[in-house]
Amino acid sequence: MDSSNPSSLPLEKSSGNVQKGKLLNIWSRCIAQPSSFLGSSISRFWANADIKNRVCSAAIGRVNFVSKCLKKFPEVSLSCNISASLSLNTGKEKVKNEDLEKQERCHKVAMIEYEIQNLERQLKKRQF
């Protein structure tokens, strides 16, 4: 069995397999509820993880960052990425300050969504 493949964990519980099982469990819980983890408690656990699992920890950190960003801008929906991309073309027009702020927030949310999609693709490539 290849120990670098996290999807092929054996049923027996050795110390290495228990840690990998914990990593997978934490990762699945983070996807379900990204705001339920604190960075300090999870970073102690990741200190002993191998390089592939550190990639997952970076993704979890970014998911936490995204959830914090979305809490700061609750009035901005995730579907505003279309508005953000259109706002790039309307830079020459005079826009009210409120509209400009909303476009900037939408653009930030769109960039965060794009980053999440890139991370998901990278994790899928590493798992298979």
UniProtKB/Swiss-Prot annotation:
It comes from the Eukaryota. This is Uncharacterized protein B0304.4. It comes from Caenorhabditis elegans.
